[in-house]
Amino acid sequence: MPVWSAVGVGLHLLSLVYAGTVAHASLAGMTEVPNIRELAEIPAVEVITRSAVMLMSAAAEKLGLSAEDPDESPQRDLDEARRLITALAGLVTASAEYLGPHAGPVRDGLKTLQLAFRESSAAPDEPGQGPGEKYTGPVW
């Protein structure tokens, strides 16, 4: 899969940050030492979105998309990627109505990962049998 496709997932997420729909600090907190906040103070949509971003990032790593050559990435693990993408699909499907303006970019990121998985597989799954497709339907 071309690296630019993986970058597309990140760009969608960055567009959420810079559009003001997600606080930059809330996404930065996943990679830096976060400010301590009471869990009860965090809106549900932020918890769901942060979880989706974490699943997307982990799946991209397991697909080897952070490497110049994904096929040679030491982090590449398609079995783990399948699990992460399926978990992401379940979360996105179950929470789409609550995500508001975040739903579209999160779904786009999910689809990009599903397509990247299909391209990475030596023997691609039949349509509808790929990771998360039991929740999203077949991905083309």
Question: Can you name each region flagged by the protein language model?
Answer:
Residues S26-W140:
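A charge-rich, low-complexity, intrinsically flexible signal that marks solvent-exposed coils, linkers
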